[in-house]
Amino acid sequence: MYLVDTIDYQKICCIIKTFEDNILFQKNYHSTWFLKSIANIQKEKYNYGLEVAFVGYSNSGKSSIINALTNQKKLAKISRTPGRTRLINIFSVTSEIRLVDFPGYGYAQVSRSISKKWKEMIFQYLNIQKCLQGLVIITDIRCPIKEIDELVINLAVSLNIPILLLLNKMDKVTRSIQKSKLFSTREKMLNFSNNINVELFSSFKKIGIHKLQFVLNNWFSSDKKLCQ
């Protein structure tokens, strides 16, 4: 039997398509544009296309990660005062694909009522948004996973929403701490689900961008049904 007879052409075509999709989406991420800011997700939610939401504690670096992903320094405005951003910012990757950036939760200088409102807004969004394809939760690698993070994770798991947990600011710690924190966080996530993806990230050093793009590409893949 010749070697050519053993080639899995279907698998090769699948690999080529995945590669082409990655190239396409990379270009799209770099041309992402700001769509709008909203205060009430229930009144202004979208009923078409696909979305991925970014959530995390204040000062975890959400805006910096979106800027790194899109290769645009000023797309997502970075506030010098953590907790300052109080609106949901929506960015369009294409006419059918969106990134949703929520206000950071839990900052001490924000009143309890506002902090509670933000948490309720996230929980409400996870429950009602049928276009949501995945949730990116961002944490500071130097800080432990907080209670609010666990509440969001629990809700997302119960709703079968895919999760990517990014340990951001990895450049702030040593390699040994990076490995230790990555291992311990992955172990902890097993208490919630076997399908939570945990990765290291540094928006400053631009480390982890390709892994983030790969996960988003999978969530936004062409075989996913568009919300209508």
Curated annotation (Swiss-Prot):
Record-level Gene Ontology MF annotations: GTP binding; metal ion binding
Metal-binding in keyword set: yes
Pfam families reported in the protein's UniProt record: MMR_HSR1
Coiled-coil ranges (or none): none
Keyword tags: Cell cycle, Cell division, GTP-binding, Magnesium, Metal-binding, Nucleotide-binding, Septation
Recorded superkingdom: Bacteria
Annotated residues for binding of Mg(2+): 63, 85
Positions of GTP binding: 56-63, 83-87, 101-104, 168-171, 201-203
Listed cofactors: Mg(2+)
NCBIfam families to which the protein is assigned, alphabetical: GTPase_YsxC
Function in brief: Necessary for normal cell division and for the maintenance of normal septation.
Family from the record: Belongs to the TRAFAC class TrmE-Era-EngA-EngB-Septin-like GTPase superfamily. EngB GTPase family.
HAMAP family assigned: GTPase_EngB (MF_00321)
Protein name: Probable GTP-binding protein EngB
Organism expressing this protein natively: Buchnera aphidicola subsp. Baizongia pistaciae (strain Bp)
